[in-house]
C-alpha cells in the first residue's frame, strides 16, 4: 500500500524533533509499491528517510520525502535465485528484488555452519534487528544495539559504535534505481564504505538508489568485540570474576533466582553483551522521546601522529605529566581522537545556547534542550563548537549529521 500526504508534519519523523513539514510525503509497504511510484512526477528534491535519526532539518522540505515500511527478517538457509520482477504485494520472507537480471545469494550457509546470512527489510528498526539477532544467538551486531534508525539507513550511513561498524557484517545491499527504474545490488566492496560514509552519500549518486533490503553475514561462533574504551571493563564487571572475556559468565545479568551452580556454567552470549551496551548507552545518551537529538553530532577526527603528539604535549603541560589523551591508533599510522574529549576540553559540556545545548553526560551530542529549539540555534551552537576546537587544537570537526 502507498500512502501519500501533502504538507506532512515531520516533527515525529526526525529525532531532533525539528518542527518542519514536507510538501509531499510518501510511505510504502513493499517493493511492488516502490515500482508503482511515478518518480518523474514527484516534487523535487527527493529525500528518502529511515528513522530520521541522523538528520537536521533546517527548514520545511520543499520536495518529496519517502519512507519505507518494508519489514521482514529472514535467515537464508539455501541458495535462492531471485525472480526477474517482484510479484509479492508485500515483502515478507523470500523478497523479490530482481528486475532485469537474476540476483543470486552465494555462499549461503546451512544451520550447522558458522556464517549465517540474514536478509532484512530496509524498514526494519535497526535495534529490533539487533534484538532478534541476539536472541537467535547470532554474533555481529550486538555492539550496535540501541542505535536509533532503520536498517536501510544503517547501510547508507555505515553506523558504528563500541569498536564495530555495520560494514563489517554487510554482505550485499539491494536497491531500486529511480533513474533507470531497475533493481540493482551492491557488494560490500562496491558500497565503498568509510567512516560514517558510503557510495550512497557521494554527491554524484546521492538519492538515486533506494535501499530495499540488506543481507548481513552474522556468525554462530562467539566473536565478542570488547577492546573499545572501557567496554571490556564494563563487561568484566557485569560478569564478575572470570578467566577470559570470551568465556565469561555474566552473573550480574542473570535472574536473581538463578542457582549459583548454574551461574558458573553460563557463558557470554550476544544477548548478554547487548544488555551491557544498552545500559551504557542509556547512561550516556538522551532518550529521543524525552529530549530531541541526532545522537553523535560530530565525527571523531583523524589526524597525523605528529599533530596528535603536539596535542598530547600541550595537554600534559596543562594537566600534568601523567595525563593521557584518549586516542586510537589506526593501521596507517594516523590517530583518531574522540571529538567528545576535545569539545569537553573547550568547556562546552552542559552549556546552553537558546533552545539548544551540549548534552551534560556526553559532549558529542547536541540536544533540543527545550523541545522548541530552532534549527538556527542548533547550527549556531555547532559553528561555535567547531571554531573553539579549531582554535584550541588546530583540528576542524565535521558534522556526522546531515543538514537538510
Please identify what each model-predicted range represents.
Residues 121, 135, 345, 391-392:
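Residues at alpha-helix termini
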Residues 1-92, 96-173, 177-179, 190:
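Anion-binding (especially nucleotide phosphate/pyrophosphate-binding) glycine-rich loop
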Residues 385:
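Phosphate/pyrophosphate-binding loops and the adjoining catalytic core of nucleotide-dependent enzymes
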Residues 40, 111, 137-140, 202, ...:
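Generic detector of short alpha-helix boundary/capping microenvironments
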Residues 5-7, 11-18, 55, 183-376, ...:
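Phosphate/pyrophosphate- and phosphate-bearing ligand-binding catalytic cores of soluble enzymes
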Amino acid at each position: 500500500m502507498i500512502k501519500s500526504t501533502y504538507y506532512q508534519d515531520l516533527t515525529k519523523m526526525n529525532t531532533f524533533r525539528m518542527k518542519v513539514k514536507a510538501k509531499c510525503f510518501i510511505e510504502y509497504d513493499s517493493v511492488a509499491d516502490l515500482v508503482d511510484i511515478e518518480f518523474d512526477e514527484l516534487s523535487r528534491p527527493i529525500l528518502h528517510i529511515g528513522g530520521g535519526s541522523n538528520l537536521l532539518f533546517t527548514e520545511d522540505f520543499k520536495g518529496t520525502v519517502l519512507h519505507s515500511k518494508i519489514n521482514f527478517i529472514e535467515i537464508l538457509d539455501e541458495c535462492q535465485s531471485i525472480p526477474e520482477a517482484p510479484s509479492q504485494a508485500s515483502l515478507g520472507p523470500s523478497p523479490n528484488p530482481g528486475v532485469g537480471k537474476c540476483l543470486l545469494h552465494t555462499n549461503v550457509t546451512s544451520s550447522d555452519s558458522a556464517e549465517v546470512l540474514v536478509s532484512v527489510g530496509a524498514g526494519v528498526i535497526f535495534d529490533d534487528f539487533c534484538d532478534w539477532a541476539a536472541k537467535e544467538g547470532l554474533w555481529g551486531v550486538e555492539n550496535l544495539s540501541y542505535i536509533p534508525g532503520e536498517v536501510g539507513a544503517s547501510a547508507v550511513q555505515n553506523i558504528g559504535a563500541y569498536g564495530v561498524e555495520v560494514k563489517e557484517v554487510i554482505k550485499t545491499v539491494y536497491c531500486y534505481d529511480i533513474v533507470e527504474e531497475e533493481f540493482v545490488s551492491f557488494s560490500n566492496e562496491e558500497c565503498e564504505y568509510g567512516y560514517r560514509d558510503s557510495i550512497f552519500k557521494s554527491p554524484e549518486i546521492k538519492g538515486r538508489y533506494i535501499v530495499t533490503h540488506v543481507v548481513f553475514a552474522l556468525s554462530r561462533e562467539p566473536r565478542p568485540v570488547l577492546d573499545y574504551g572501557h567496554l571490556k571493563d564494563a563487561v568484566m564487571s557485569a560478569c564478575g570474576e572470570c578467566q577470559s572475556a570470551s568465556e565469561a559468565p555474566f552473573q550480574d545479568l542473570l535472574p536473581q533466582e538463578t542457582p549459583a551452580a548454574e551461574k558458573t556454567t553460563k557463558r557470554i552470549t550476544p544477548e548478554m553483551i547487548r544488555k551491557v551496551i544498552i545500559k551504557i548507552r542509556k547512561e550516556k545518551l538522551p532518550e529521543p522521546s524525552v529530549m530531541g537529538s541526532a545522537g553523535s553530532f560530530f565525527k571523531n577526527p583523524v589526524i597525523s601522529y605528529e599533530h596528535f603528539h603536539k596535542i598530547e604535549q600541550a595537554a600534559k603541560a596543562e594537566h600534568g605529566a601523567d595525563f593521557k589523551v584518549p586516542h586510537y591508533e589506526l593501521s596507517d599510522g594516523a590517530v583518531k581522537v574522540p571529538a567528545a574529549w576535545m569539545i569537553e576540553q573547550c568547556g562546552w559540556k552542559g552549556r546552553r545556547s537558546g533552545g539548544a545545548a551540549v548534552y551534560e553526560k556526553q559532549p558529542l551530542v547536541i540536544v533540543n534542550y527545550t523541545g522548541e529549539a530552532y534549527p538556527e540555534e542548533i547550527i549556531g551552537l555547532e559553528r561555535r563548537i567547531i571554531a573553539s576546537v579549531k582554535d584550541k587544537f588546530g583540528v576542524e570537526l565535521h558534522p556526522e549529521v546531515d543538514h537538510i
